[in-house]
Structure formats: C-alpha cells, structure tokens
C-alpha cells in the first residue's frame, strides 16, 4: 500500500481538484504541504460545487482527516472565512476533521499589503502574484522572524515577536513610503483570531507519523504546479515555495520514506496564469478556442489563462524533478475536433537543439519550440470512461505523450465530472 503525492506537472490549474477528490475517497488523511490560499480549486460532489483555496480537498468528504502542514503559510482570517463558507454548505469542519501544524507560519495583514504594493508599483519586475501575502510571509519564515500558529497560544510573548517583525517591516515600509504598522493594532487582531484557530492546532509531524505507522492511507495534495517551484520553475516568475514532490516530506514533517507513488497532473494542452516564459503559447484563434472550451479562468482571481500546445519538454522535466511515477492527463476532450494537434518535442536555442528549459531567464526568452504535428480526431472524447470509448487517434495522442515525457498515463480525465475518468493504474495500489 502506497501513500500518494499529487503534484501539478505544468504551471498549475491542471485539474488537480477532480483527481484529488477521486483519490481522497480511498485515503484516510489528506495533507496540504505547501503554498497558501493563492491557488484555488473547485470540487463538484453530488451536484454541489465547493470552492477551496487553503483547506485540503478531503474536508468536504466525511470520515477523512484533513491536515494543513508546516510547509503551508496560513492566513488565519481567510481560513476562518473559508471554513464558515463551506459550513454554510452543510460541511462539518471541526478539530476532529481538520488539524493545522502548530509550526506553520501565519500570513499577516502587513504581508498582504506589501505584496499588493510591490506588484502594483510601477518600478520593478511584475511576477504576476495573487497579492495575498504568500511571498512576504515566506520571506519572514526564512528570515526567522515569522509569527507561527503556536505563538497565538502565548499572548504574553506576542508583543516581543511583533516587535521583531515590525523592526523589519516598518523600516521597509518607510523606505517604500507606506504608513507604518501599529504594534498594538496587530496584537489586538492576533488575540481576536487566536481562539478561532488554536482548537485546530496540533503537532502534525507526530500525528502523521502515528497514523502512517497505523497503516492509514495518506494523500499529499500539492497546490499550483512544479514549473512554479521556487527552485525548479521558471524563476523569477515562480511562487515562493517548493512544489516538487519532495516538499511533501519537508512540508508535513514526515521522512521521505513515507512518500510512495508520485502522481503528476497535466492537461492535454498547456496553460499559464500571470507573467513568465511560455514557449508554446498560442496567440491565434486556436488559443482562444482552447481557452473558451476549457473555461480557462482562475478559480480565485478570475484571471484569464494563457493557452498553448502541450509541451512535452517541460512535462518531461517535471517528471524528473518530482520523481513522477505516472501522469493523470486531463481535459483531453477540449482537443476534440481539431484537424491537427501540435506537441512540442524539443527546443532550439540560438540555432542549437536543447532538450530542457534552461535556468537562465535570458535563454528562456530566446527558446523556440520544435513541434511534431499529430492528426486530430472528429469524434468526441467527452465523458469517455474506457479506452473503447476513445477515438483511435486520441489513443495515439495519449500514447505519444507517454513516449515523449517518459512516464505512463495512469488516469485519463475526459470531463469535469469525477466519474468521467479512465483508470489505467490506481496509485494507492503500488
């Protein structure tokens, strides 16, 4: 029996929500291990739509333990709002079903303000952040001045911790021409939110270790995509955390031996939100058609996603950096009806072939994709639940992707409906 890590194999928005929901039925515990509330996802269960950003997907299924690990940065005000919202939809969320790592870093209002100011300022590089304070909170974590969940339990020690945070932030704000943060006001806000958050706090690494030893199945739910990883993504157009599968261990407190099967999620084409390189981006009617059919707008932000052909070079790269065992290929039905489909199989850089995306930002801007043209199919794949339901050419497309990325397709999704899934290999049965 394997524990399973789910990671996005592109730039996020690959359809992880549906796959995680499908897998969570077989899991006992669902763990978020990185990021914050910057990456939303939608679940449709028994006709009811749930929109989550910070809460693990398991929270909407009864009998599951949901865990927010130490690798996540937690906006406590957003978390309570999200809990109340899904409670209003009839979902039971209590300390018996949700635990939060006591050593998780908190996102403070000053982090959101700084994020917004940086991104909207005329000077400097625009990264395309969601302006929710994720990056500044991680900066404080690495700078060893963060306020963590556990600190809320010691109100007498909070003033000194706030002073340490504000020594840095108020100096920065003065330099940026922003009003300084009032220490008493921040202390009051934290004291007010503490009793709502602390009942969920736990020593998560110990809890997960005990459950693992008891034979419980653990599903590690990644957010965003590996191409946004702060180390292995298209830097600096990345998020502020590690996203690759190894982070599941670091961000939950379990050793790497607890990770079993790594399932990467990839669309049958490619999308990206925000700034940054995108070698296969389409600026024509085909790109518009893909975006319209695929409803390519952000769950949290409503931002329009950039669309392009499937980039086998990039997915092959994430297969390697995340140690992906198998891929869940989603949105195959969006490609129905195209006479021909292109797949990027390599790059040219200054007239020379390259088999990966270089780390240099300047080199990334000069990359030219090399395409293989594959005949399309006129029949529909929407709603297919077996190989027999698929057009022959669609099967050839999937098989060619497997060859190019160096990993098998374990699951194939043919619509947003959770049952419209073709299973080749169950990750939990490794």
From Swiss-Prot:
CDD domains: AdSS
Pfam families recorded: Adenylsucc_synt (PF00709)
Top-level division of the source organism's lineage: Bacteria
GO biological process assignments: 'de novo' AMP biosynthetic process; IMP metabolic process
Pathway terms, separated by semicolons: Purine metabolism; AMP biosynthesis via de novo pathway; AMP from IMP: step 1/2
Annotated binding of IMP, by residue: 13-16, 38-41, 130, 144, 224, 239, 303
Alphabetized InterPro entries for the sequence: Adenylosuccin_syn_GTP-bd (IPR018220), Adenylosuccin_syn_Lys_AS (IPR033128), Adenylosuccinate_synth_dom1 (IPR042109), Adenylosuccinate_synth_dom2 (IPR042110), Adenylosuccinate_synth_dom3 (IPR042111), Adenylosuccinate_synthetase (IPR001114), P-loop_NTPase (IPR027417)
UniProt keyword annotations, A-Z: Cytoplasm, GTP-binding, Ligase, Magnesium, Metal-binding, Nucleotide-binding, Purine biosynthesis
Location(s) in or outside the cell: Cytoplasm
Record-annotated active site: 13 (proton acceptor), 41 (proton donor)
EC category: ligase
Co-factor: note: Binds 1 Mg(2+) ion per subunit.
Coiled coil: none
Residues the entry annotates as binding Mg(2+): 13, 40
The protein's Enzyme Commission number: 6.3.4.4
Major place of residence: cytoplasm
GO molecular function: adenylosuccinate synthase activity; GTP binding; magnesium ion binding
Residues reported to bind substrate: 299-305
Oligomeric and partner information: Homodimer.
UniProt record similarity statement: Belongs to the adenylosuccinate synthetase family.
Function: Plays an important role in the de novo pathway of purine nucleotide biosynthesis. Catalyzes the first committed step in the biosynthesis of AMP from IMP.
Protein known as: Adenylosuccinate synthetase
Native species: Methylobacterium radiotolerans (strain ATCC 27329 / DSM 1819 / JCM 2831 / NBRC 15690 / NCIMB 10815 / 0-1)
Gene: purA
């Amino acid at each position: 029996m394997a524990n399973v890590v789910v990671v996005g194999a592109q730039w996020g928005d690959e359809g992880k929500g549906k796959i995680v929901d499908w897998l969570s039925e077989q899991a006992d515990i669902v763990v978020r291990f990185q990021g914050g509330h910057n990456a939303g996802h939608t679940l449709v269960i028994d006709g009811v739509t749930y929109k989550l950003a910070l809460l693990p997907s398991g929270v909407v299924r009864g009998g599951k333990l949901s865990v927010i690990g130490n690798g996540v940065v937690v906006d406590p005000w957003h978390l309570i709002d999200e809990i109340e919202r899904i409670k209003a939809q009839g979902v039971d969320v209590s300390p018996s079903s949700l635990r939060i790592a006591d050593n998780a870093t908190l996102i403070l209002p000053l982090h959101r303000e700084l994020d917004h100011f940086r991104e909207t300022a005329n000077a400097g590089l625009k990264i395309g952040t969601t302006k929710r304070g994720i990056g500044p909170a991680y900066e404080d974590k690495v700078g060893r001045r963060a306020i963590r969940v556990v600190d809320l339990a010691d109100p007498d020690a909070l003033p000194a911790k706030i002073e340490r945070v504000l020594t840095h932030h108020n100096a920065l704000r003065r330099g940026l021409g922003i009003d300084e943060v009032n220490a008493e006001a921040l202390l009051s806000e934290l004291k007010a939110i503490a009793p709502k958050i602390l009942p969920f706090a736990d020593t998560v690494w110990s809890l997960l270790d005990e459950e693992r030893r008891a034979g419980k199945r653990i599903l590690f739910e990644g957010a965003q995509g590996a191409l946004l990883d702060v180390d292995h993504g298209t830097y600096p157009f990345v998020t502020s955390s590690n996203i690759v599968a190894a982070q599941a261990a670091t961000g939950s407190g379990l050793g790497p031996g607890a990770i079993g099967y790594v399932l990467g999620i990839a669309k049958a084409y490619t999308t990206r939100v925000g700034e940054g390189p995108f070698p296969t981006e389409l600026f024509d009617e085909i790109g518009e058609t893909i975006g319209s059919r695929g409803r390519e707008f952000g769950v949290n932000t409503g931002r329009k996603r950039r669309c392009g052909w499937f980039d086998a070079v990039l997915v092959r790269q994430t297969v390697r950096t995340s140690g992906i065992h198998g891929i869940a290929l989603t949105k195959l039905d969006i490609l129905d009806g195209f006479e021909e489909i292109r797949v990027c199989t390599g790059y040219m850089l200054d007239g020379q072939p390259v088999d990966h995306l270089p780390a240099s930002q300047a080199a990334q801007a000069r990359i030219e994709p090399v395409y293989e043209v594959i005949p399309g199919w006129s029949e529909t794949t929407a709603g297919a639940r077996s190989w027999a339901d698929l057009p022959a050419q669609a099967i050839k497309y999937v098989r060619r992707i497997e060859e190019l990325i160096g990993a098998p397709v374990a699951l194939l999704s043919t619509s947003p409906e959770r049952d419209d899934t073709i299973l080749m290999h169950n990750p939990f049965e490794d």
